[in-house]
Structures are given as structure tokens and as C-alpha cells.
Amino acid sequence: MTEDRPRGNLGKVLAVSLAHLVHDTPSAFLAPVLPLLIDRFGLTVFMAGLLDVVRRIPALANPFLGLVADRICIRWFIIIAPGLTAVAMSFLGLAPAYAVLVILLLVAGVSSAVFHVTAPVMMRHVSTGRIGRGMSFYMLGGELARTLG
């Protein structure tokens, strides 16, 4: 018995998965550099913990971002978000003040929220009938990023 499902486009699936890897690797930089930031800025445990909270707060907008993703071309979000997150996270070491750290992490958080809402939608489009396989590659990219970061 043959399967009538379309084969999917493995190249595009791998491209979206690679984008997930590239996006999430700099996102994982906060934990290793946090002790350095604590020393540099004399942060309390509360202030240090708040930095990660600030980075995650934009995820509360995910339902709204999903509505936006349903109405506009999402390709640009997937292209721009990894670079924006990498730049914001890379500048943490150059931040002159705690407030700048907060702003950089907020930018990284918004970029992350936009990416993580739109990339699975793109994966569904490029997987063409093999959504499970596509999403498994997508998730692999994210897990490898946490390992590398």
C-alpha cells in the first residue's frame, strides 16, 4: 500500500529548524553570564531573578501575536527575530546600567515571543502533510540551542 501524503520540503523544514537553533542559542546566554552581571552591577538576588522574568513577560502577548500572525506575512518575523535576539543578548556585556539590561532583555523577550508564535505556523506550511516530522525537527533545533548556549 502506498502513501498519498505529500513528501514535504525537507530543505525548508531544516531551514526553519536552523532558525530555531540560531534564535534560541543566544537566548540561553543569560544563565551563564548572570554571575558576571551580579558582580559587575552589585545586583541582589531579587534584581538578578527579575532579569529573567523581564525576558519572559512578553510571552504574555502570545495570543495577540497569534492573531497578528494569522493576518500578515510571517516570513519576515522568522528572518529578523534571530538576529534581533542575538544582538540584544550580545549587548548584555556592554550595558552600562541595570536599566539598560532590562531594556535589552525586554527586546530579546519580544523578539522571542514573536519568533515562537510564528515559526511553528511556518513549519506547518513547509511540512506539507508531515507536520509531526517538521515539528520534531523544529523542537530539535530549540533543544540543541539550549545545549549549545
Language model region names:
Residues 10-48, 52-53:
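Helix-loop boundary and gating motifs at the non-cytosolic
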Residues 17, 49, 79, 132, ...:
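Conserved glycine-rich helix-kink/hinge and helix-boundary motifs of the Major Facilitator Superfamily
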Residues 24, 28, 109-117, 147:
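Small-residue-rich segments within alpha-helical transmembrane domains of MFS-like 12-TM solute carriers
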Residues 42, 73, 94-99, 128:
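Helix-breaking motifs and short loop linkers at transmembrane-helix boundaries and internal kinks
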Residues 55-57, 143-144:
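Short hydrophobic/small-residue motifs within alpha-helical transmembrane segments
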Residues 60-96:
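Conserved MFS/SLC helix-loop-helix module at the cytosolic interface between two early adjacent transmembrane helices
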Residues 88, 99-107:
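Paired small-residue
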Residues 104-142:
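Cytoplasmic helix-loop-helix junction between adjacent transmembrane helices
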